[in-house]
From Swiss-Prot:
This is Elongation factor P. It comes from Lactiplantibacillus plantarum (strain ATCC BAA-793 / NCIMB 8826 / WCFS1). SMART domains: EFP, Elong-fact-P_C. Pathway: Protein biosynthesis; polypeptide chain elongation. Keywords: Cytoplasm, Elongation factor, Protein biosynthesis. GO terms for cellular component: cytoplasm.
Length: 185
């Protein structure tokens, strides 16, 4: 059991039979009445973000979240197969659990899988990945690094904005957090 005094960003708690990650929180002491904690929580099963208020000193269960390093092997219909790099155990994750991450997921990529009592809650990609440009408009003579940008389709199907000098076949380093071009690989 933990108290609201132990709150910190990233902590996972169990409230109302749901697993929540604390996104942000604030201790409030009004001039009249008891103190309370205003928090923004993200449901790890559904991804929904919700504001919740707890009275100061309220106690709740800390959710035992595990993170395992796993390697993405292949897609199997609507599921994706990952292998634990330590035990070589394979698990299938439904595509709807990892919809946002699919655009940067490549075979043999290592990811962090978030588990709660054996249930997969999601995956965390590395902050940057190296991907090849599958298709983009050809550059025009005189394009410079300081110019604008154009859309490019990557090998995984993701579409990002890249500088004019990038051409099909180039390998790029892409930020997976905000889906932006970082540099050439």
């Amino acid at each position: 059991m933990i108290s609201t005094a132990d709150f910190k960003n990233g902590l996972t708690i169990e409230v109302d039979n749901a697993i929540w990650r604390i996104v942000e929180f604030q201790h409030v002491k009004p001039g009249k009445g008891g103190a309370f904690v205003r928090s923004k929580l993200k449901n790890l099963r559904t991804g929904a973000v919700q504001d919740k208020t707890f009275r100061a000193g309220a106690r709740m269960e800390q959710a035992p979240i595990e993170k395992s390093t796993m390697q993405y092997l292949y897609a199997d219909g609507d599921s994706y197969v990952f292998m634990n790099t330590e035990t070589y155990e394979q698990i299938e994750i439904p595509g709807d659990h990892i919809q946002d991450e699919l655009k940067f997921l490549k075979e043999n990529m290592e990811v962090q899988v978030t588990l709660y009592k054996g249930e997969v809650l999601g995956i965390d990609l590395p902050n940057t990945v190296t991907l090849e440009v599958a298709e983009t408009e050809p550059g025009i003579k005189g394009d410079t690094a300081s110019g604008g940008s154009k859309p490019a389709t990557l090998e995984t199907g993701a579409i990002i904005q890249v500088p004019f000098f990038v051409k099909a076949g180039d390998k790029l380093i892409v930020n997976t957090v905000d889906s932006t071009y970082v540099s050439r690989a």
